Amino acid sequence: MGCNRNCGLIAGAVIGAVLAVFGGILMPVGDMLIEKTIKKEVVLEEGTIAFKNWVKTGTDVYRQFWIFDVQNPDEVTVNSSKIKVKQRGPYTYRVRYLAKENITQDPETHTVSFLQPNGAIFEPSLSVGTEDDTFTILNLAVAAAPQLYPNTFMQGILNSFIKKSKSSMFQNRTLKELLWGYTDPFLNLVPYPITTTIGVFYPYNNTADGIYKVFNGKDDISKVAIIDTYKGRKNLSYWSSYCDLINGTDAASFPPFVEKTRVLQFFSSDICRSIYAVFGAEINLKGIPVYRFILPSFAFASPFQNPDNHCFCTEKIISKNCTLYGVLDIGKCKEGKPVYISLPHFLHGSPELAEPIESLSPNEEEHSTYLDVEPITGFTLRFAKRLQVNMLVKPAKKIEALKNLKHNYIVPILWLNETGTIGDEKAEMFRNQVTGKINLLGLVEIVLLSVGVVMFIAFMISYCACRSKRVN
């Protein structure tokens, strides 16, 4: 009888040890299986989960616009007063709903090339008004004239066309005209072969961004989705040194197994440069753990604050010898037009940027850019890209519409918020196919290890106690 009991206790201890060992072995083996599966499914080729969502995003992406409506145009034109603006919006468009085109795999370089077609559909139910709403805004053509034609003789000639067209420093335009283009009356009179249609995003509809060539990750998963070339080049020709390089992905996804210490680099054609995001917080998005990466203030810092930005300073006067921060001159990639990009309301910008503009109120929560990235797959499941489009206007003695200005203005035209969040159906699918299976495997590992250890200890204690009793 004693033998049977001892044998049973020993058998229980052995079973517990086996369970514990199996649970311990399952941890690295399970992690290896997960890694192998993820590496297979994030490759950009036919048949993978990543490829299906990469060709055409399953997430609804919206671009909201807020327009800075100028309230005192005459005061500014005559007296060079502060510009009083009233923010109006949001006006919402659905974007990025078209599938990638001309997708071509290159098995030799392990890359895939494509075009991303552009399109925008107005969403009245998500907007405060219609595309026909009218705003008083800076006259884009008149403001650009002194920058494009610094020669005073040329400015005198242009002034005659400006006067004849009855153009001034400010103009009234509908939302549709401002965003997507209108025939400018001043430019229409210029007898040179120039583009007479102008708009903040003109041309956009029926155009395409690219050609992009990105690594498909088949030979090296750490390079998946990273851009190899853009429009056939590895650099942009807008900046000097390393600032001109095209780095990272397009921010829709990143190589898998993202760590908090990683700096996520991505390229944005909207701002004509590569940029980066750093870890901010852990967040739960529809039951999926994600890492929030934020665009740091250092990204638009002056070279004095962040020496790495020295090659983004392209001139010394407007930038006040490269000390101005929070704004980026992208004129070189806008055909020389004096276009400046910043965060909305000059968030993280030099105080002198907002000083000549009334009614700006920068807010970190509303105006910062972030990416919510699922760390195992590297997929971006939610994002908010926020930026402001500004235009420089300078005094010009030979142009009557600008001759009374006493100083330069970097005038905010509009700011946008482009957002996308994984839908409920896609989130459930993601939980079932990825996070759910990983969590289940982790639970099985812990249960096996815990139960095995408890069984082994309990049966061994019982066995030792039984033997001690027999000896006594």
Curated annotation (Swiss-Prot):
GO molecular function: low-density lipoprotein particle binding; low-density lipoprotein particle receptor activity; scavenger receptor activity
PTM comment text: Palmitoylated by ZDHHC5. Palmitoylation is required for proper localization at the plasma membrane. Ubiquitinated at Lys-469. Ubiquitination is induced by fatty acids such as oleic acid and leads to degradation by the proteasome. Ubiquitination and degradation are inhibited by insulin which blocks the effect of fatty acids.
Protein family: Belongs to the CD36 family.
GO cellular component: apical plasma membrane; brush border membrane; caveola; cell surface; Golgi apparatus; membrane; membrane raft
Subcellular location: Cell membrane; Membrane raft; Golgi apparatus; Apical cell membrane
Cross-link (Glycyl lysine isopeptide (Lys-Gly) (interchain with G-Cter in ubiquitin)): K469
Provenance organism: Bos taurus (Bovine)
Name of protein: Platelet glycoprotein 4
Listed PANTHER family: PLATELET GLYCOPROTEIN 4 (PTHR11923:SF12), SCAVENGER RECEPTOR CLASS B TYPE-1 SR-B1 (PTHR11923)
Disulfide bridge map: C243-C311, C272-C333, C313-C322
Lipid positions (S-palmitoyl cysteine): C3, C7, C464, C466
Glycan attachment residues as annotated in the record: N79, N102, N172, N205, N235, N247, N321, N417
Role this protein plays: Multifunctional glycoprotein that acts as a receptor for a broad range of ligands. Ligands can be of proteinaceous nature like thrombospondin, fibronectin, collagen or amyloid-beta as well as of lipidic nature such as oxidized low-density lipoprotein (oxLDL), anionic phospholipids, long-chain fatty acids and bacterial diacylated lipopeptides. They are generally multivalent and can therefore engage multiple receptors simultaneously, the resulting formation of CD36 clusters initiates signal transduction and internalization of receptor-ligand complexes.
Extracellular compartment spans: 30-439
Keyword terms, alphabetized: Cell adhesion, Cell membrane, Disulfide bond, Glycoprotein, Golgi apparatus, Isopeptide bond, Lipid transport, Lipoprotein, Membrane, Palmitate, Receptor, Transmembrane, Transmembrane helix, Transport, Ubl conjugation
Topology in the lipid bilayer: Multi-pass membrane protein
